[in-house]
């Protein structure tokens, strides 16, 4: 009996402290967020009140050790009257970034703020920055005021950041789109700003935000780690040029979940350096589908691995799930799963193209290619807008390897009949019911 008590005591003393110390940060944060302190803070944020009420008590009746500090952009001079509010936002950011503990930056609801190009830089002293966008942030309309044409709103080198609130970010893309060479081939091909870019941000969550009418791409994660992008609405017209919805570059451990993307380019694009990417619960269309690539442009080296796309619905897109690489590239795209996907009137539901070329002039034929391997298509069904629903255009010299299809059924939308497959230089394995089949 005593021996059992001793053993139990040793267990409690040894393991319980480590359990509490390793309790996930986001769970602790969820506990904080459920308290009365958060409810009151959140309620006052939306209406634009400053919140520094240290006397508030949580639901258990105990005063918190320290209340989060809140920095309202209006307090720093934002007017939301059609003039430039960039300086006020920057001042609010600098105050929050230089503070310790948990801090809020608040853009209240029922306000429409105009911003020129801004960069919110770290590193910051705060343990967590929560950027609450309740209102609407709109891009400055004069392109000549953009010193650097490729970015509008940038978060750079910021750890432990959350951007949320249910508000809108509008890129005013209608000013930029007519200047694109894809709209007017007589014009030079110049870049336009990405609406929101996160660069080298770790432990990042972007949620409950609507991004619309981006100048070019809507949302980019570049060289980030441990990212969650949740409950996003990304929209722009189907004919808006290069308006990718969510672009992932050089980023590891990212979850994109429960989001709707309707754009003029890829709904989600995943390019070199990205690893451990999961996209689930995605509704895509119009747009160019969910793409890995393009990879290997200009004979470059590219690597993408461990990608899972599941529980997606694609509606009227020009592609479904796509892997695209340029001739002449090097590297690999491997360990990729597309599963539990519904296609509705999609032009190329399943496609691998190692002969991708997005140029006016023809691309030269080259022997090297990015290796595509270990790709699984599972539980995919729906309709194709063209007779060919499955297309594998793989390299003669570096063919696609380890491509598997399981329980795939795609029919021709125009004929309501069995569709066709076009396959070249691919080593394919099929299981279960697969239609169409490569011949």
Curated annotation (Swiss-Prot):
PROSITE patterns: POLYGALACTURONASE. It holds the Pfam family Glyco_hydro_28. GO terms for biological process: anther dehiscence; cell wall modification involved in abscission; fruit dehiscence; pectin catabolic process; pollen sperm cell differentiation. GO terms for cellular component: extracellular region. Residues 43-69 are annotated as: Disordered. The gene is QRT2. Keywords: Cell wall, Cell wall biogenesis/degradation, Glycosidase, Hydrolase, Repeat, Secreted, Signal. This is Polygalacturonase QRT2. Residues 1-21 form the signal peptide. It comes from Arabidopsis thaliana (Mouse-ear cress). Residues 44-62 have a biased composition (Basic residues). Polygalacturonase required for cell type-specific pectin degradation to separate microspores. Involved in anther dehiscence and floral organ abscission. PANTHER family: PTHR31375. It is found in: Secreted, Cell wall. Its EC number is 3.2.1.15. It catalyses: (1,4-alpha-D-galacturonosyl)n+m + H2O = (1,4-alpha-D-galacturonosyl)n + (1,4-alpha-D-galacturonosyl)m. Transmembrane segments: none annotated. Expressed predominantly in roots with lower expression levels in rosette leaves, flower buds and siliques. Bearly detected in seeds. Found in flowers undergoing floral organ abscission. Also expressed early in anther development, at the time of microspore separation. SUPFAM superfamilies: Pectin lyase-like. PbH1 repeats lie at residues 201-250, 251-272, 304-325, 333-354. Disruption phenotype: The mature pollen grains are arranged in a tetrad. No visible phenotype regarding floral organ abscission. Changing residue 372 to A: In qrt2-1; loss of function. Belongs to the glycosyl hydrolase 28 family. One of its GO terms (molecular function) is polygalacturonase activity. The active site is at 265 (proton donor), 288. It comes from the Eukaryota. InterPro entries: Glyco_hydro_28 (IPR000743), PbH1 (IPR006626), Pectin_lyas_fold (IPR012334), Pectin_lyase_fold/virulence (IPR011050).
